[in-house]
Amino acid sequence: AIVSSPEIAPIYAEAFGIGESRIKPIGTPRTDVFFDCDYVAAAKERLYSQYPLLRGKKICLFAPTFRGANVHDAEYPESFFDCEKFANALGTDWAVIIKMHPFIKKPVQIPKSVSNRVFDLSTEREINDILFITDVLVTDYSSVIFENAVIGNACVLYAPDLEQYTDGRGFYFDYSDYSCGSVVYSFSELPQAVLAAKPGEAQRKFKERFVSLCDGNSSARFVETILESKK
C-alpha cells in the first residue's frame, strides 16, 4: 500500500491489518497532475468558458460529504446550508460553487435571486479541477481536504453535526487534528470565517503531516518502488 506521508503509515498499517514495512510513503500519484501547468490551465479555462460568470470572482467551493449509510439514503440536510443567505453575506465579489457528493442525486435548489452567483457543479466529474479555480474550500468530513492542502487553497471546516457524525462513523484522528484552517459549528459563523480565511500555519502543518510527499513526483517514486520490489 502507498500513502501520502510517513506520519500516516502506521495508521494505515493498523487500519488494514498489515505490517508497516508493507506501507510505502511515496505520495499519491493522482496528485501529480496538480503540478502539470498545462493541465491546470486547461482545466481552469474549461470551467471559465462553461461558467463565464465565475470569471473575475473570488470563489468559495462548498463541498460537504453525504449523510446516511450508503448511496441509497445519501443526503445533505438542507437546514445546514442556505445558499441564498450565504451568497448574500459574502457579497457580490464572490461566487459560490456547490459540489455535492456523487451519492447525492437530488439537484441543489438555487433561488433566482442568487442564480448569477451560486452554481451547482455537482455533476462535474473532477472536483480537483474545481479546486484549481477555488479561493476558499468549505467542507466538513470529506477527504477533499487532502487534495486541497496539496493545491494550497484556504479551507474552512463547517461541522454543524460533529457529535452525531463522530458517533456514527468516527475518525482515525481527533477531528481537531484535521484542522487546516478555521473550524465553525454553526451556519451563522460560516460567512465571516470564509471572508477571513487564508492559508496559514495550520495549513502548513496539516500539509506536512498528511500530504508531504504529494509533490509532483509520486508516480516516479511509485515506479521506482515497483522496480525495486522485482529485484
Model-derived regions: residue spans:
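Short, well-ordered alpha-helix to beta-strand connector turns
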Residues: 9, 20, 93-94, 115, ...
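Short, well-ordered beta-strand core segments
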Residues: 1, 137-138, 155
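Donor nucleotide-activated moiety binding/catalytic core segment of transferases
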Residues: 97, 102-146
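Conserved catalytic-core segment of nucleotide-activated headgroup transferases in glycan assembly
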Residues: 23, 29-110, 184
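Helix N-cap/beta->alpha junction signal
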Residues: 4-7, 100-102, 141, 186
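Active-site-proximal region of nucleotide-activated glycan assembly enzymes
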Residues: 1-41
